């Protein structure tokens, strides 16, 4: 169970970074991975207002925000065309659609879980974080 004392919706990455320096504060995403243990969080840092849920395409690369969901990855036409469906195939069987609608790329990478198909997918693509 997770207990949150205060929720802070930050207005900048700098503010989030500053708050995250204290060990009892945690950045929130979909919160699915935080539920894996008992936690007491002094300040929960909400990044939802920072536009980090975007997938942007340039001529050189794709940029995937840390708040982009696994479902966004699964359905993104440009990413899947480039990778011949690899990203769709890597995430489409992760739990269920409702879970993928909430689970974020950032949480999947940061958690470094041994069962993570997302980590393997980005490793295979030689992605930069």
Which role does the model predict for each range below?
Residues 1-129:
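C-terminal structural segment of proteins
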